[in-house]
Amino acid sequence: MKKVEKKYRFGQMHSVEDFSRILGADGLDFPVSQDLSVLAQPFELYGKTVPNRLGIQPLEGFDGLPSGAPSDLIFRRYHRYASGGAGLIWYESIAISDDGRCNPLQMVINEETVGEIGRLIRESDQAAWESMGHKPYNVLQLTHSGRRSNNKNWEPTPLAVCENPYMDDHTSIDGSCGKIEIATDEKIEEIIEGFIHGAELAAEAGFDCVDVKVCHEYILRELLSAFTRRQWRYGHPRTRALFDIIDGIRRRVGGGIEICVRLNAYDCVPYPYGWGMVKKEGVMEPDLTEPVKLCNMLVERGVKLINLSTMMPRYRPYGTGLMAEHDDQPITPYAGVHDLLKATRDIKAQTPGGIFMCTGLTWLEQFGANVGAGGIEQGWFDIAGFGRQAFAYPDFAKDILCGKGMQRNKCCLTCDKCYDLIQIGHTTTGCVPRDQEVYLPLYRKYVQKK
């Protein structure tokens, strides 16, 4: 992963005014509010009450059991999230099949694992009730990792929709590459059935909602950007597989579970190999026309909750046209976060009835809460979503709700050591600086000794 240059010293910013002035001087006009009370407001979602507007993003710990069931570390993590006060918990990606795992320790949902996954939900809800007196709204993200798939030995086993010169040479999370298999009609049909059956099992486990994952570099997202492969069942319309899954869940599960999506607003990969980009070959510039159209189609089908992301929020959808993750130039992530939040604002403004969760606030450290509140007040999004912040600071929501704001000495340091554990160490991940008892020994063993 590219080296990050952290241009701003948030520890030297003593107020929201300092934050706005310093970042605003660089053209980064984040929405901000000193009043965080909007984050505590409950709201209605699919007929249920979500206790507040603070959400935890789906972030894998790479720490499931080889069987695909949750481990003790997963139980620990979600108990901490739930007792930490967030109103919406978006459970990390669970693969619909063994061949759809991005790593050998990713959870898999099937008849053998659903019982333990259900216990995870029940115990986490109990932890939330005991700590906060509320039940969080629980979303499960289902996935097939596609070109990011790896087998039990961490060897890449990529399944792609089409050739992509910007992505074909780095299919695994560590930058390595495997022999790419191009998906057939029959394979996509198998994946569609896997998502539908996964939703059935998610309902059995007790989730409120299931996320049909359409983001990052995974298989359903790639179907949206498959402009170069028209002559097959899923080439036109490119949304066919997504809507076959949604319609199949409705038929199979009915009202037993709601449906949402986590969706790339744009891909940071040029046309004709990227989604949400200007349709000029090799041009790195976003065009939100298709994402807006898709979001409206989703809302019309009753899929109202949409969580917008991109390949990675730190990267801007501008530049040389190469996947920024894989060249050597260091980046500053703040403009990428600003671009993504603006795209969320623009898509939400053109999608009546949609409920949008934002991405990228962890990069703003203790001011993430102020931007979350400002974004909700100003109509940029409806739910303030935090990802790696929850690894480092699982009770961030509780501190906000209790009037303390976000405590800088508990915040994510955006040091990327959690990524190092995955990419270099091929091991379980979490916050090395803030959760040292568990993760510092792993970091020393699997990263520093390599």
Regions found by a protein language model. Give the residues of each.
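Flavin-dependent oxidoreductase catalytic cores
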Residues: M1-K450
